[in-house]
Amino acid sequence: MLSTALSPSSPHADYNSYSSSLSPTSPRFHASSAPHGRRSPSPSRLESLLDAPLPSCRPSRSPRSRKIRDALARHIRPHLTPRTLTMLFLWMLSVWSIHHFFLPISSLSRLSNPRAEEHFLSTAFPPPPQRIGDDHLDSVDPRWRAYHPLPAPDPPFPRLRPTRFLPPQCLEQWFAEGETLCGAKELGEEEKLDATWLWVNGSDHRWRDSMIEWREKENVNSPERHFREQNELVHSMRSVLDALPGHLRTFHLILADYTFNYPEDLELVPFSIIPDLEKVASKSKGRRHPRDLPGTPPSFSNLTERVTPESISASLASHLQSEWRIVQTPTWLDFSRRDPSDPSHPFHPYSVSKAGERGQHYAEASYPTLRYASHWEVFHTPSVDRDGRQELMGEREWRENEWKKKALPTFNSMAIESRIGWLPGLADAIIALNDDFFLLRPHAVSDFHSPLYGSVIRFDHGYNQQVRPEVVKSHINDPGEIGGLYHANAILSQRFPHRLRPYFAHVPKVITRGLHHEASLMFKEALTESSTRRFREMKIGEGDVQMQWLLTSLRVERWREALLWTWVVANMGTISGSQDRWDDATRTAIKDMFGFTENDNDVVKIEVHRGERWTLEPGRMQKAFEQAGWEAPKATEFLFSSMDGTMPPLLKHGEDPAQNDRCMIDLNRCFGVFWTREEDILSTDMMKRLTFQYPECGDCMIMALVTASGTLGLNAFFPPKETTVTAPELAPGDGYPKFLPPPHLPLTPTWHEADFSLANILSTTALPGEQVDIRQYCMRLLSRYLYLDARSVSHFHMLKSAEHAQRVFKMIQDNPRVSILGMNDDIESDYDEVKRLMNEWFEMRWPRKAVWEREWDPVKDRYID
């Protein structure tokens, strides 16, 4: 079935556009070219051809052709009367109606062999639409900005998109053999990262008045230091620009916003955009305000002129009050220099050539865009069912508006973080930073994420720092993050094994939008409720949800689940040609894997030892990145790769690390009646048994299969090559899907209600009746959750006083190995002096201003080779 690709400029292309095989963004697109062996004409040759006299193109009028025309005119023309044409039209309309409504005929695309690739959304998220009004103008007042919010994403949303898959031949080599012969040509360009920041100016009187009002309404006492602003944001952004020059796509600021107060906020609307807004606000076509009539035009070139109630129509006044809002903005931000694609931007090629410069520094040629989004624009609820495909029906818009009334305004960063996946124009790979995070050394994209190894997670390996899997009532209104961590692990432990999970280091977090969307569907009830907690100190529900930690741990669990599903369901469940069943052939395969002989029928337990692995041996990773033409990591030490199975549990201090290199499989306990009574069992039941009911069995089987795969790759998990499974046929009354979610497992909030059968999984991720290469399917599934456990030299400091601040800054300056810095404002004394010391150190460390800063100097702040 051929799917069309919407143009980015289309009003419906913002969230829904996807590529067909005819789209240049599709991997199946082939551009037409000149025939082999023939050169295209040169420009001079084309010019001579155009200047040459054209040959005669008149058709030959042979006697035979004249006779045919005369016969047609003599026999057909008399019957072409209005009456016969009307009857012919009615007959065609009747035939069309019968076959369209009563006896539908399959379209040619259905009669041909449809392919799932033509229905997957593009891996790249389309750019969002422009806001109404000239959003590239600078703000009238640097503290606030009048804006028209972007609409909610078109339903169904979120639409799960594929991660960036390797090409099929590279994917096979990488997962089966642990290395690939593919180079830069096959693997493509290195990914660019997006970066996100949450920001609020706690000294803004408008924001403070709102916070005090809601604090009294909710009867809470929120610490003031959570909202103090020490000018950290601008330097945090500078540090990321300096650490990753040329490797960043978009910076996103998530900002607080307010309702539009009329007429006080009129002065924040740029005077130059009033004519365009009048057209938007006018409901009748052609209706015009008297100001726009000939003879009375004001001068709109004066950007400093203020808008007054007398200068706008009643319809525009109503439009601004009902549709527009005010967003809080950093005073140093010049909105006219946010987008390098704007010809007026200093780093746009047009501006560079106009200035007479011969070339650009690579960091300027690939300078990131800066986007902003308000809380109003990111606070939405899912409009799609948990299958990731079916649109939720009912009074959805009304329900979302009622929920927004409970959730906004919000003063809870955890609630805001849970909505990051709704940021318009967000890339798939994201660095999420607090405004007090700083990068101190050069980094590569691969220090955070890559298609080969996945996302880089920096866990805290302290056993006593692990997060408990239960809601603790005394921590529900905790002003810190403990309550949010416990709640996050509690909901994770309903869907995955119930256990302690490691905390993460206080550093920037790597998240993917695809996984954020999965979590938004899987845990939508818990996240929807927790997002209504305006303050962390509130007692609503079961507490906050620490979204960044949830996503980090979810990646680890989804990888483990996908590994076991690949072996249990896709491999062992299809080994005898049947689908979703473990039988005698499965028992034989398991015995062969463990080397059973005829005399081993009484064996009950098997001790498994972790085999030697080369995945993280010195130089191997660097070689893989060099072969791909991508930068190797610069500031990270890697401890574990998901390509070696699943991360071993943390050990108490003093315990022998070797105990994580062996395990015991109790065949009777792990396989149940399938082994003890030799009964056949559904593979989906065995999946739940090994993965969730007895998780130690699943973990030990993973160790055994990784060892069986050899020193590299995961070949023992996968079904044999050329293994295909037929997806379920189209249900009566259902139509072909307009888009397909990528390979993924159920998004249910508990494992008990999940259906892991091949039929169910393929019913939503493959076309009806499609022959699915299940081996490639599993590799694409695993690509979605790849990860590395790593550590960087990072420092985290809570500044207490001026003397403490001086010691901290000296310690950092004396240690050039520190790559990541977190610095919390916990000032107890010498507040003004600490603030001065902070800003002096910031300016000393990152003097080069970003192009979107108001005081940016085109000479002093340029990049120099």
UniProtKB/Swiss-Prot annotation:
Cofactor(s) essential for the protein: Mn(2+)
Segments of this protein annotated with the region Disordered: 1-66, 283-304
Glycan-carrying positions: 201, 302
EC number(s) on file: 2.7.8.32
Gene Ontology terms, MF aspect: glycosyltransferase activity; UDP-N-acetylglucosamine-lysosomal-enzyme N-acetylglucosaminephosphotransferase activity
Role, per record: Xylosylphosphotransferase that is specific for UDP-xylose as a donor and mannose as an acceptor to form a xylose-alpha-1-phosphate-6-mannose linkage. Functions in the O-glycosylation of proteins en route through the secretory pathway.
Residue ranges, Lumenal side: 106-865
Protein source organism: Cryptococcus gattii serotype B (strain WM276 / ATCC MYA-4071)
Record's protein name: 3-O-alpha-D-mannopyranosyl-alpha-D-mannopyranose xylosylphosphotransferase
Chief subcellular location: Golgi
Assigned protein family: Belongs to the XPT1 family.
Residue spans of biased composition, Polar residues class: 1-10
